[in-house]
Amino acid sequence: MFIDWRQLPAATDALQWAGWIWRGTAVWDKGNSRPQKGRFRQQAEYIVWGSNGDMPINRPVPCLPGVFKYGNPQNRIHLTEKPLPLMRDVVKITEPGGHILDPFAGSGTTILAAVLEGYTATGIEVTGEYARRARERIEQELRQAA
């Protein structure tokens, strides 16, 4: 779950309240942001992650970095769209052959990243226009990758 600092306490509480185990937080460093004089730059989002069960230490997944440095994508479909290379890295926390659920699919980046990395995936998007555009994007990019 990608959030800014203001939602960090509520997001981690909600994850645990839903019965999941909060596993930690990573950082997406976007590199640049709108400067605010007299304040720290808001150039990062937090990645809150957890599991709905045990995660043995010997799982066949790589050790991922705690900070991911990727700029915002150009020509975004959705306001909060994430860069595809970032999501291709993040989905690797899932065991090989795993299934990835994105309940806020937006432009479909997580679903596309999951499929490109060999996972199955389900995306849920409540806004019809974004769902349509995400589906078209995923289909087009998968055709190009084939």
Where are these regions (language model features)?
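Core catalytic lobe of class I
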Residues: M1-R132
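Short, conserved SAM-binding/catalytic segment
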Residues: R135-A146
